[in-house]
């Protein structure tokens, strides 16, 4: 028997377990909370564990503001073999006896920091003629995705042996760890693939914010584990308005901002009333214009 849906809203940072897809994780939380709506702020591969921010209810309207934030990963690269998926889930497609030294590896890392061109893995969610590249690849089609610019702000070697190395990486949206591992190995004259991957931070959330699925399932008061909708907007200017102005915004109307310090122009901001998010929008000519309105 289907559960009755309820108007629950907020953010939860799930510590996604190994083997679960991001879509499955969203479905699980939506069921646990009987939420009307749910969505995640950035796909995490089934192979990966770690931070997967999930929005419930009205928080789904704030997903883009988390999705675009920076991310941090720890991963293990195994030397000597390439796979079809660039991780340990795929079949081996090439081998090499070459093993880089630690000195060679450290010398290669600077070329993979900053803004670089990266070719996404064939097994990815990128759309090709309306279909996911991964679906085409599984169907046996050759998928050649064009390189695209990505930004890697930090790439640190944590441990090195002849057979595998551990790294920590900070990057921006659109960066594929699997592609980095593939390209780094090829630059060192060998082959490689990712055998372990963990997202440790995303858009200001850290591992201290993460909640295990087992903890969530066992909780008798799950709502207290939710973070406010405004959590996703904490990096944007907040405009505190009164009830009358909030009512105008909820009907989709702009409001004139009053007061000596009222802003004239802001690209992205959010309006609140009594601590609750009313709308997300921008300020032009001293008027706040809503682009997304949230239910009370």
Residue ranges of each PLM-predicted region?
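Accessory RNA 3′-end/elbow-binding domains used by RNA modification enzymes
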Residues: 1-40, 44, 48, 69, ...
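Helix-hairpin-helix/helix-loop-helix acidic hairpins
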Residues: 149-163
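Acidic, low-complexity central loop/insert segments
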Residues: 59, 64-118
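Glycine/acidic-rich beta-strand-loop module
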Residues: 37-67, 122, 135-138
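Extended alpha-helical targeting/anchoring segments
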Residues: 124, 128-147, 152
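Residue-level signal for inorganic ion chemistry
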Residues: 54, 75, 130, 180, ...
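Pseudouridine synthase
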Residues: 125, 132, 137, 164-204
């Amino acid at each position: 028997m289907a559960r009755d849906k309820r108007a629950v809203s907020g953010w939860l940072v799930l510590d996604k377990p190994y083997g679960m897809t991001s879509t499955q994780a969203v479905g699980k939380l939506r069921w646990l909370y009987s939420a009307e709506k749910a969505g995640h702020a950035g796909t995490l591969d089934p192979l990966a564990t770690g931070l997967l921010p999930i929005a419930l209810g009205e928080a789904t309207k704030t997903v883009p503001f988390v999705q675009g934030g920076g991310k941090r990963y720890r991963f293990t690269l195994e030397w000597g073999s390439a796979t079809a998926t660039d991780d340990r889930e795929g079949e081996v497609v090439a081998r090499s006896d070459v093993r880089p030294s630690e000195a060679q590896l450290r010398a290669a890392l600077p070329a993979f920091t900053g803004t670089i061109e990266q070719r996404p893995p064939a097994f990815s969610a990128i759309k090709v003629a309306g279909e996911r590249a991964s679906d085409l690849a599984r169907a046996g089609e050759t998928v050649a995705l064009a390189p695209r610019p990505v930004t890697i702000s930090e790439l640190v070697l944590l441990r090195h042996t002849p057979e595998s190395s551990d790294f920590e990486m900070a990057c921006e949206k659109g960066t594929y760890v699997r592609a980095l591992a593939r390209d780094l190995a090829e630059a060192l004259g060998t082959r490689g693939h990712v055998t372990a991957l963990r997202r440790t931070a995303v858009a200001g959330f850290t591992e201290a914010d993460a909640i295990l699925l087992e903890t969530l399932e066992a909780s008798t008061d799950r709502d207290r584990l939710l973070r406010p909708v405004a959590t996703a907007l904490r990096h944007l200017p907040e405009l505190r308005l009164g009830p009358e102005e909030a009512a105008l915004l909820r009907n989709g109307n702009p409001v004139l901002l009053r007061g000596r310090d009222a802003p004239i122009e802001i690209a992205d901001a959010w309006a609140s009333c009594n601590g609750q998010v009313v709308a997300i929008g921008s300020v032009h000519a001293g008027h706040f214009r809503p682009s997304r309105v949230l239910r009370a």
